[in-house]
Every structure is written in structure tokens, then in C-alpha cells.
From Swiss-Prot:
It is an enzyme of class 3 (hydrolase). Glycosylated. Its main location: secreted. Has fibrino(geno)lytic activity on the alpha and beta chains of fibrinogen (FGA and FGB). Inhibits human ADP- and collagen-induced platelet aggregation on platelet-rich plasma but does not affect the thrombin-induced aggregation of rabbit washed platelets. Slightly degrades plasminogen. This is Snake venom metalloproteinase fibrolase.
Length: 202
């Protein structure tokens, strides 16, 4: 194995816009979120990164932060909320906000680079932008990739197919593989930062 195993305990928050999109059908939302995680698990197999879904929170009664089109602002507020609120009641390593708000500049996701395990910065936001689960999962896997030190792929990066996970553009014909560049960047991140929270097996 090129990579030692790592274990990410994930919390996914579905905001009020997602609750509304699914007509407040929490069962449907949970099913969708479980499918997302199952897809993310597949994408990360090559990196020996294992995911468990620690919790799903659905903001049925209204958002607990001010979710807004400016993605950087929403991401910052979500990180602050995680540190202040979520971490105090739920052990986890990383939190992702699933939303259905029209984000500025056609953004479908945003995350902090190298944020994994940091109380505020181990977060991402992902738009529920497709009826194809794998497409949304690819975006969430991409944002978690940023948290794990991966940058966008340049033209020289290769994953043996179209559209690697860290490609700047999401394509229908995605290969859902991490490129050689991503693997090198992930390895460098582990070496330089060795984020402690993902060492323990849940």
C-alpha cells in the first residue's frame, strides 16, 4: 500500500434549502446523504482513506447560520458554527454543508485548503447541484480533497480517464479517480502536517 490508512468521521449538514427541496422528507434526505457517502468511500479507496458518517443534521426549521450566495462568507460562518456549536456536541473530524442556494459565480463547492482536523477550517460547502448522486458526491470528495491538501489538477495531471476528482471543472464523463498530482499532494500533506484526528479507527 502506498498510503497508510486514514479514517475520517464525517458530519453532513443539510441546510434549510435542501430540506425544502426534498419537501422536508427527512427519510429521502438521509437516503441521499448515505448514497453520497457510499460514493465518496469508493472515490477515496485508492488513497486508503476510510469514511464513516458520524451524523446527519437537517435544518428543517431554518438555517442555524446565514447561508448566502457569497460562498466564502457562508463557508466562514459554517466553520465558526462548527467550532462553536457542532464540535461541542458531536465528535467528528470534518463537516460538509449541503445546500441548494444559488451560489455566486456558479460555484458548486468551496473548502479550506489543508483544513482537516482544524476546529474551524475542517469544513466545506457543497451545492446539491445534480439529480445524479455521483456528481454531487464528486463535488464533496473534491472539497474534502482541498481539506486534505490537494490543489486543482493542471493539464499535466493524469488519472487514466477524463475529469479527475480534483479537476477544476466537473464533467459528466468524470472518471472519479484521483490524479497522480493529487496523490503526491496528499502524501506531502500527510508528511508535512500529519493531521492527528484521522489516525484513529472509529
Amino acid at each position: 500500500e502506498r498510503f497508510a490508512p486514514r479514517y475520517i468521521e464525517l458530519v453532513i449538514v443539510a441546510d434549510h434549502s435542501v430540506a425544502t427541496k426534498y419537501n422536508d422528507n427527512v427519510t429521502a434526505i438521509l437516503s441521499w446523504v448515505h448514497q453520497l457517502v457510499n460514493n465518496i468511500i469508493l472515490f477515496y479507496r485508492d488513497l486508503n482513506v476510510h469514511f464513516t458518517l458520524s451524523a446527519v443534521e437537517v435544518w428543517s426549521n431554518g438555517d442555524l447560520i446565514n447561508v448566502q450566495p457569497e460562498a466564502t462568507v457562508t463557508l466562514n460562518l459554517f466553520g465558526e458554527w462548527r467550532e462553536r456549536d457542532l464540535l461541542n456536541r458531536r465528535m467528528h473530524d470534518n463537516a460538509q454543508l449541503l445546500n441548494n442556494v444559488a451560489l455566486d459565480d456558479n460555484t458548486i463547492g468551496l473548502a479550506y485548503d489543508e483544513g482537516m482536523c482544524d476546529p474551524k477550517y475542517s469544513v466545506g460547502i457543497v451545492k446539491d447541484h445534480s439529480a445524479i448522486n455521483r456528481m454531487v458526491a464528486a463535488t464533496m470528495a473534491h472539497e474534502i480533497g482541498h481539506n486534505l491538501g490537494m490543489n486543482h489538477d493542471g493539464s499535466q495531471c493524469n488519472c487514466g480517464g477524463n475529469g479527475c476528482v480534483m479537476s477544476a471543472v466537473l464533467m459528466q464523463q468524470h472518471s472519479y479517480q484521483f490524479s497522480d498530482c493529487s496523490k503526491d499532494e496528499y502524501q506531502r500533506y500527510l508528511t508535512n502536517h500529519n493531521p492527528q484526528c484521522i489516525l484513529n479507527q472509529p
